[in-house]
Every structure is written in structure tokens, then in C-alpha cells.
Curated annotation (Swiss-Prot):
The chain crosses the membrane at residues 5-25, 334-354, 357-377, 431-451, 476-496, 522-542. One of its GO terms (molecular function) is membrane insertase activity. GO terms for cellular component: plasma membrane. Keywords: Cell inner membrane, Cell membrane, Chaperone, Membrane, Protein transport, Transmembrane, Transmembrane helix, Transport. This is Membrane protein insertase YidC. It is a multi-pass membrane protein. One of its GO terms (biological process) is protein insertion into membrane. It is found in: Cell inner membrane. PANTHER family: CYTOCHROME C OXIDASE ASSEMBLY PROTEIN COX18, MITOCHONDRIAL, OXA1. Required for the insertion and/or proper folding and/or complex formation of integral membrane proteins into the membrane. Involved in integration of membrane proteins that insert both dependently and independently of the Sec translocase complex, as well as at least some lipoproteins. Aids folding of multispanning membrane proteins. The gene is yidC. It comes from Rickettsia africae (strain ESF-5). Interacts with the Sec translocase complex via SecD. Specifically interacts with transmembrane segments of nascent integral membrane proteins during membrane integration.
Length: 560
């Protein structure tokens, strides 16, 4: 095997080693450090006093003093919580279908919390005016409601009348999932023109979160002028504000690993939008907001505008549905499928399709792996044949190297002539590896970022395919009463992966180059430690892929 091929393989191995090494030695310790920071921050937050309102809506960060005001209760199949009638704020929302962890008494996931709470996070829509003389509903307005409960079967109608007789009507509906629709109507019963602008905002108190560096996006996000905009919390903190003027805003919001809160404005006009950061009384806050152009409402006329709020789990089929139903461009990209989006999403679709039949995502992974293996069988067959031919040609290649050791150009010319004569492709042996790399990372992404894989069980001790194997050989898989350090958490599935990788190597043609052969012998051991902290679903895929490769190699050896 010539130096170019050796360098190619070495580059692939080095790249994988850097990526997995970064995950193992940097990301995991960083996550542990951040978990400690979260605990410290929570303790400090308990000592802080409640915050009062400091900034006007839609112009910056909004913090409102919470008081005992009337609320509209939210009840649906997916959500519970309430909407504050003071300022019409969505600030109390719990996701009924998701628990915080796998413990028996785990509470449900809370998404929104009132402004003065420890994890303040809320959304609101409303109206502002460039004239101070125009009396509009604001953060202190107490709305009147025709109902105390909002449900998919029962919309809520709100109203408020200012001192000039201008009537403001709001109709709120919620579907069975996570989408609120808010229709605002202004009936100008006064004798003056009303210049108004509609706005929407999502405001969040920053809390240290677990970050998987360069693996997924968390923070402000949106689709503006049909382009996906992603900003980390640090980006916005450094810039203080990122502004877009008179732009087409399909949606803007704040995303977590599994959860999304998003504003979806009316498509009737362009909007100015902002991604903001502010530090108030020692508290960091982030806000995304939009504001419409000025709309003049003449006396005796009325004006209506509709906007939506998505607040919930980032389910792939749900985001796809809303994207198609309401023409919300790139809404599915709120899920960070990564560089291999065109592969990752079809891989998820395939897994989800088979899950519909077998009811287990682990089994679905096994089925998809078989299909991928069958699709790649012809390529693998050619690859194994090429590797075998390369090994048989090695003595002749060595002879040519000795003969033309002082003439590099002639050496390469003679070797290429030999390849052509024997009909050997020197890179054919690398093709299955190169093809598997995007498939591998696609499955990793699916396991890591999709809500469908969160807390999805397999069989036996595997209760969450998106988490690492909870067992370790260093306490005899739980028989000994102690927990080894993180770097010794080498469970049954990482060991099975390493064993199957070793057996696969034994059945495959040994690389012709002695140095490469020595490197390959150590790969199962290296991968054992690197993969031990990865999602166990990925290890199930890799182990099963190795087993199928062993069967495939047996077939090729027998019939070729």
C-alpha cells in the first residue's frame, strides 16, 4: 500500500481520535463542572431578592414584578399551566408528557416560569405605539376574560377598553400539542387615528446548562429572510444585541437540546427583530423579539393581526407538520441535525418508521443497520477483494520500491502501472470506512438531539438509549458496592463493541503495510475507552454493525 493510502487512513483514524477524544476528555469533564456550577448558582439564586419591572416591552429585556393576579388555566393533552391576565403573559407552562429524569417520582418538565422566579422564562405578544398619547394595553393591564380555562375545545376571549373607548380584543386558542394562536383585534371607536405596532417577545433568565461543545446548538435561533440564524448565548452576550431590520421573519425563539419556545409572527408584513442580552441587578437575561411596521387605524375602523407561540418538545413529525401547515420555513431546523442533515433526517425517518411496527427504538436501530449493510454490500465486497489483491501485490510493490528507490517519479509511475495492469483500486479498501463515517455521525446525532430518543429504553439494564451504558466492569457490573470514576465507566456494551471489532479485524484481510497492521490491532482497545461515554444506542449500532460485517466477511470468503 503506497504512502498516500497510508496517509489517508492515518488521517481518518487521527480525525476520529481527535473527535472522540475531545468528547471523552473535554466535553464530559466540562459537563460535570457545569453541573457543579448549576448547583452553586441555584444556591446563590435563593439568596437574591425578587426583581421589579425595569424596561419597556419590545425595546429591550423585560422583567416584571409578579403579583397575585387572576390567571387562565391551560389544560390540554400535552400542556398544563396558566396565562397571567396581568400583561397577558405566557409564563407558567409544564410539559405533561415528559419527566425530568427516570426516577419514579420525577416531576414533569417545566418550560415557562414567571419573571421573578429562579428559572424565569416567558413569552408575550402585544401592541405598542410611537405616540405616548395612545393608550394601549401594557404590562400592568388586567384583561377581562370570558373563561377561566383554555383548552383545545374551548378558546378564550379577552377584552379591554381604554379611556377613549377603543376596544382591544384577544382570542387565544391552543391545539393538542404545543401551539398557541393569538389573534389581536383593535376596534377604533375614538375620533383619532391610532398608530400601532404589534410585537412579540420571549425572555429568559440565563441558567448554566450542560453544553456539548460543537455537537448541538442551544440559545437564540430563528429563520430570518429564509436563512437559519443561530447564536450561542456567548455570542449574544458579547454583542449585547443582534438586530435585523425590515426582514421576513418566519420564526424566532430560544432552543434547548430537546425544548423550543418560538414566536411565529403574521406573514402580512416584514418585521424588525432583535436577539438581546442584558445584565440587571446581577441577573443575566436573554430576549428575542419582533416588532411590526406602524399600522394606522382610522376612526371607526378595526384591525386584526394573528401570531403564534410554539412552546414544547421538538418532535420531528410535529415541527414538520407545523412547517407545512403554516408555511414556517426551516422550522424543523430547530432540531440540530448537524452537517449531515440530508442523511441524518432520513436516518431518523427510517428509525421512526420501524419503531411504529416494533415499538422499540433499539430494535429499530438494528433493523436500519441491516438495511444500510445490505445497501453497501456490493461496495464492501469490492473493497474486500481489492484489499486481498493489494496484499498479494505487496511483494511486487516492494520489489519496485527497491528498484526505483532513487527516482520517486518513476517509482510512482511503475506502481500505478502495476495497479492498472492488475485492475486494483488502491483506495477501494477505504471506501466502506469513508461511507460509514457520515452514517455513523448521523446515527449519533439522531440519538443525541431527538426528543424521541430521550429516555427510550432497549432491553435489560438499558433504560435510555441517549445516555451512556450505566454499568462498568470495574465494579463487576454492579455486584461490588462502589462507583468507579468516570473514565473507568466501561460497561457491557462498550466491551461487546470492542470484542466484535477485534473479531471483525481477524476475519478481514490484514493490511499489507506492517505499520498500518500494528495500528489497526490497537483500534479496538482505543475505541473501547473512547466510546464508553457515548450514547449506548450508538454502541448497539456499532456492535451490531460489526456482527453483520463478520457475517458478511464469512460469506465473501466462502463464496469468493
Amino acid at each position: 500500500m503506497n504512502n498516500n493510502i497510508i496517509n489517508l487512513i492515518a488521517a481518518i483514524i487521527l480525525s476520529l481520535s481527535i473527535i472522540f477524544g475531545w468528547q471523552y476528555f473535554v466535553v464530559k469533564p466540562e459537563q460535570k463542572k457545569q453541573q457543579q456550577q448549576i448547583a452553586v448558582q441555584k444556591a446563590e439564586n435563593l439568596k437574591k431578592q425578587q426583581l421589579k419591572a425595569v424596561v419597556e416591552p419590545a425595546t429591550g429585556i423585560v422583567v416584571q414584578e409578579e403579583s397575585q393576579v387572576q390567571r387562565i388555566k391551560i389544560e390540554s393533552e400535552s400542556l398544563t399551566g396558566s396565562i397571567s391576565l396581568k400583561g397577558l403573559r405566557f409564563d407558567d407552562l409544564i410539559l405533561k408528557k415528559y419527566k425530568q429524569d427516570l426516577s419514579k417520582n420525577s416531576p414533569e418538565v417545566r418550560l415557562f416560569s414567571p419573571a421573578n422566579t429562579e428559572n424565569a422564562y416567558f413569552a408575550e405578544v402585544g401592541l405598542v405605539s410611537n405616540l405616548s398619547s395612545v393608550k394601549l394595553p401594557n404590562n400592568d393591564t388586567i384583561w377581562n376574560s370570558d373563561s377561566e380555562i383554555l383548552s383545545p375545545e374551548k378558546p378564550v376571549h379577552l377584552f379591554w377598553v381604554n379611556e377613549d373607548g377603543v376596544k382591544f380584543l384577544v382570542t387565544i386558542t391552543v391545539d393538542e400539542n404545543y401551539l398557541f394562536t393569538i389573534e389581536q383585534t383593535i376596534v377604533n371607536n375614538s375620533d383619532k387615528e391610532l398608530p400601532v405596532q404589534s410585537y412579540g417577545l420571549i425572555n429568559r433568565k440565563y441558567i448554566a446548562v450542560e453544553k456539548a461543545v460543537n455537537i448541538l446548538h442551544q440559545g437564540p435561533i430563528g429563520c430570518i429572510d429564509e436563512n437559519l440564524k443561530e447564536y450561542s448565548y456567548d455570542d449574544i452576550k458579547d454583542k449585547k444585541s443582534e438586530k435585523f431590520v425590515a426582514s421576513k421573519v418566519d420564526w424566532i425563539g430560544i432552543t434547548d437540546k430537546y425544548w423550543l419556545s418560538s414566536l411565529i409572527p403574521d406573514k402580512s408584513s416584514n418585521y424588525s427583530s432583535n436577539f438581546n442580552y442584558a445584565l440587571k441587578q446581577g441577573t443575566e437575561r436573554y430576549q428575542v423579539d419582533f416588532i411590526s411596521p406602524v399600522q394606522i387605524i382610522k376612526p371607526g375602523e378595526d384591525f386584526s393581526i394573528k401570531s403564534r407561540i410554539f412552546a414544547g418538545a421538538k418532535k420531528v413529525d410535529l415541527l414538520d407538520k407545523y412547517e407545512k401547515q403554516y408555511d414556517i420555513k426551516l422550522f424543523d431546523r430547530a432540531i440540530d441535525f448537524g452537517w449531515f442533515y440530508i442523511i441524518t433526517k432520513p436516518v431518523f425517518y427510517a428509525m421512526n418508521f420501524f419503531y411504529g411496527y416494533v415499538g422499540n427504538f433499539g430494535v429499530s436501530i438494528l433493523i436500519v443497520t441491516v438495511i444500510i449493510k445490505l445497501l453497501m454490500f456490493t461496495l464492501a465486497n469490492k473493497s474486500y477483494r481489492s484489499m486481498k489483491k493489494m496484499k498479494n501485490l505487496q511483494p511486487e510493490i516492494d520489489r519496485i520500491k527497491n528498484l526505483y528507490s532513487d527516482d520517486k517519479a518513476r517509482l510512482n509511475q511503475e506502481i500505478m502501472a502495476l495497479y492498472k495492469k492488475e485492475k486494483v483500486n488502491p483506495v477501494a479498501g477505504c471506501l466502506p470506512i469513508l461511507v460509514q463515517i457520515p452514517v455513523f455521525f448521523s446515527i449519533y446525532k439522531v440519538l443525541y438531539v431527538t426528543i424521541e430518543m430521550r429516555q427510550a429504553p432497549f432491553y435489560g439494564w438499558i433504560k435510555d438509549l441517549s445516555a451512556s451504558d450505566p454499568t462498568t466492569i470495574f465494579n463487576l457490573f454492579g455486584l461490588l458496592p462502589f462507583s468507579p470514576p468516570l473514565f473507568l465507566m466501561i460497561g457491557a456494551w462498550p466491551i461487546l463493541m470492542a470484542i466484535t471489532m477485534f473479531l471483525q479485524q481477524k476475519m478481514s484481510p490484514e493490511p499489507a503495510d506492517p505499520m498500518q497492521a500494528q495500528v489497526m490491532k490497537f483500534m479496538p482497545l482505543i475505541f473501547l475507552f473512547m466510546f464508553s461515554s457515548f450514547p449506548v444506542g450508538l454502541l448497539i449500532y456499532w456492535s451490531w454493525n460489526n456482527i453483520l460485517s463478520i457475517i458478511q466477511q464469512y460469506y465473501i470468503n466462502k463464496f469468493n
